[in-house]
């Protein structure tokens, strides 16, 4: 677990100076760069959506929560649905990053990512609950 935490920190730490520079710049170039960065975020989400249905159960990538890790069928269903949603969400992020006023870009991107994650986690919980209810009905 410590190795994973260190790798996350080593990936995130270099991003802070870049984000600070992007935030502090006020020239036209920074606005274009800002749009470019968030368009790239959208493209990354599209890529994630494309590969998510193909991911097998693992401890590195995907929605690694108790319900998905315990049941391969729930893992598959959640990642297939999430793949479609992340693909669509990536297009929405890339589109809005290019055309929406700059002051709205960050709240919209954060909102889209929050909805994508929360829907996928809720979907996993509902599938697990449904499977548990089905299992309990068979026991009677």
Model-assigned labels for residue ranges:
Residues 26-38, 53-68:
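Membrane-proximal helix-loop-helix units in multi-pass membrane proteins
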Residues 30, 95-110:
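Extracellular/periplasmic helix-loop-helix junctions in multi-pass membrane proteins
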Residues 31-48, 108-112:
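Alpha-helical transmembrane segments
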